[in-house]
Amino acid sequence: MLAEPINLQSWISENKDLLQPPVNNYCLHRGGATVMIVGGPNERTDYHVNQTPEYFHQIKGDMTLKVVDDGKFRDITIREGDSFLLPGNVPHNPVRYADTIGLVVEQDRPKGVNDKIRWYCSNCREIVHQVEFYCYDLGTQVKDAILAFDGDDEARTCKCGTYNYSRPN
């Protein structure tokens, strides 16, 4: 049986408490694609790499999508009302500010295709740590990877000697 439509504005006003750090996401729909509502502020420094595109629509407030584009770090501002389609395989870190709400759509992962969560050194910009996994639950797996990094001093220490953080300082 088909699900009933969801009024996003009503859902957001009734369920803001479900949008908790470090990722602040809640999965509304699953099956073929995952549709998430994501609130701010979030608390993360990781970059997500997945092989499929991600669609961002900013419902309330602005956000910054930090990306590594052809080897260069840069910021993309997605303003309230804007939509943006991020191609697959682009490392990205969505930075969400206080009292902001966005909608994100991600395609279900093909079998055998893994996601990566990586952290770049805050000093030398080299990859300090990376985990790879088959993503079947965006609601929990990204958060679990962030919490594991947060508790692993060895993973957080770069070859250059810099100690890195899972949350912005």
UniProtKB/Swiss-Prot annotation:
Cysteine disulfide partners in this protein: none
Primary location recorded for the protein, binned into one broad class: cytoplasm
Cofactors, names only: Fe(2+)
GO cellular component: cytoplasm
Pathway(s) per entry: Cofactor biosynthesis; NAD(+) biosynthesis; quinolinate from L-kynurenine: step 3/3
Binding site for O2: 44
InterPro entries, A to Z: 3hydroanth_dOase, RmlC-like_jellyroll, RmlC_Cupin_sf
Subcellular localization, as worded in the UniProt entry: Cytoplasm
Residues the record lists as binding substrate: 54, 96, 106
Gene Ontology MF, one: 3-hydroxyanthranilate 3,4-dioxygenase activity
This enzyme's EC code(s): 1.13.11.6
Reactions catalysed, as given in the entry: 3-hydroxyanthranilate + O2 = (2Z,4Z)-2-amino-3-carboxymuconate 6-semialdehyde
UniProt KW keywords: Cytoplasm, Dioxygenase, Iron, Metal-binding, Oxidoreductase, Pyridine nucleotide biosynthesis
Record-listed a divalent metal cation binding positions: 121, 124, 158, 160
SUPFAM superfamilies named among the record's database cross-references: RmlC-like cupins
Gene Ontology terms: biological process: 'de novo' NAD biosynthetic process from L-tryptophan; anthranilate metabolic process; L-tryptophan catabolic process; quinolinate biosynthetic process
Binding site for Fe cation: 48, 54, 92
NCBIfam families per the UniProt record, alphabetical: anthran_nbaC (TIGR03037)
PANTHER family according to UniProt: 3-HYDROXYANTHRANILATE 3,4-DIOXYGENASE (PTHR15497:SF1)
Family membership noted in the UniProt record: Belongs to the 3-HAO family.
Task performed by this protein: Catalyzes the oxidative ring opening of 3-hydroxyanthranilate to 2-amino-3-carboxymuconate semialdehyde, which spontaneously cyclizes to quinolinate.
Protein name: 3-hydroxyanthranilate 3,4-dioxygenase
Organism (species): Meyerozyma guilliermondii (strain ATCC 6260 / CBS 566 / DSM 6381 / JCM 1539 / NBRC 10279 / NRRL Y-324) (Yeast)
Gene (name only): BNA1
